[in-house]
Every structure is written in C-alpha cells, then in structure tokens.
Swiss-Prot record:
It comes from the Viruses. Plays a role in the down-regulation of the host NKG2D ligand MICA by targeting ER-resident MICA to proteasomal degradation prior to the GPI-anchoring step. In turn, MICA reduction diminishes NK-cell killing of HCMV-infected cells. This is Uncharacterized protein UL147A. It comes from Human cytomegalovirus (strain Merlin). It is found in: Host endoplasmic reticulum membrane.
Length: 75
C-alpha cells in the first residue's frame, strides 16, 4: 500500500481514538462516581440520560474498533 493511505488510515484512527476518549471523559465528568463531583449535590441521571450515555459509550467503542480494523486492512 501507498504511504499516503497508511498515513490517512493512522490519522483517521488517531482522530477516532481522540473523539471517543473525549466522549468517555464527558460521560465520566457528568457521572456521580467521579471524584470531582460533590456527592451531596449529585443526582443520579434519569433513564433517558443514562441510555444516551450508554449509546455514546458504545458508539465510541465501535468507532475505535472500526478504525483499528481499517488500519489493519490498509497496513
């Protein structure tokens, strides 16, 4: 494969990893289990918010897996 395609694949994978870690960091920041949250003021998210967080975490994980497969196929 061309060096260009390898660079594009690795760049895509690094962008997907960055995006997914930012999603997971945002979810962790909003959770009550985070050490930076004052537990007295913490409210558990309702079911809709929890489902959205689960969906976003699954999306982030899927993006990293697909990106890894892409890089594996290209390289």
């Amino acid at each position: 494969m061309s060096l260009f395609y390898r660079a594009v694949a690795l760049g895509t994978l690094s962008a997907l990893v960055w995006y997914s870690t930012s999603i997971l960091a945002e979810i962790n920041e909003n959770s009550c289990s985070s050490s930076s949250v004052d537990h007295e003021d913490c409210e558990e998210p309702d079911e809709i918010v929890r489902e959205e967080q689960d969906y976003r975490a699954l999306l982030a994980f899927s993006l990293v897996i697909c990106g890894t497969l892409l890089v594996t196929c290209v390289i």
